[in-house]
Amino acid sequence: MIYVSLTTIPQRIKYLNKSIESLLKQSKKPDKIFINIPFKYQRFKEVVSDNEIPKFDDSIIEITRCEDCGPGTKLLGSLNKLKKDSLVILADDDNAYEDYMVEKFFHFYSIASNNAYSFYVHPLGNFGIGQGADGFAINTNHLNGIKNFYDTVVKDYKELFLYDDLWISYFLYFFKKNKILSLREHLKKGI
């Protein structure tokens, strides 16, 4: 299975269609796109009511109402729906993605599924930080324990709560021993 998972916030929900449309136009279609929307937000007074959520005609899109885990809701909101031996691609709600994103991630996942991939990886010390804004592809087998990590290490620390790319990468590198590799050289050029 290939999943794409993202979240949104009240201020950006009106822009969600652009991101979703780009995901539906992928050269390799994901099997499921999760849009994880908290019932209420820790950072905002506003809420997203059911009638504010855009309606999508495509059956691969699933809206998941969930608790607010900050930007990490893009992963944690649908975590219990992800099957083993699958690829989950984290995306942001305010980006339109190139039509080859899913295909490239799946290609590299098929070759070396023990790695995680992003089109841009920010170096920090000995490990890289995958970027959801550029797509962040992870083998679902390596997510066992990440919710507990979030609950015990991240949830109550504002410094981490807002930086999902950092704590997800930290978990993958230090707890699951995954390399997080950049696919920057594999961006299409001149097309």
Regions from the language model: what does each represent?
Residues 99-124:
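Conserved donor-nucleotide/metal-binding helix-loop-beta segment in metal-dependent transferases, i.e.
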Residues 1-25, 34:
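N-proximal low-complexity "stem/linker" segments adjacent to membrane-targeting elements
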Residues 1, 14-19, 155-191:
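C-terminal catalytic/acceptor-binding lobe
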Residues 36-86:
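Active-site-proximal specificity loops/subdomain of glycosyltransferases
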Residues 2, 24-35, 59-61, 86:
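Short loop->beta transition adjacent to catalytic acidic/histidine clusters or analogous donor-positioning motifs
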Residues 85-96:
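Short beta-strand-to-loop acidic/aromatic patch adjacent to the donor-nucleotide binding site
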Residues 19-31, 39-40, 52-55:
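Short, acidic, metal-binding catalytic loop of nucleotide-sugar glycosyltransferases
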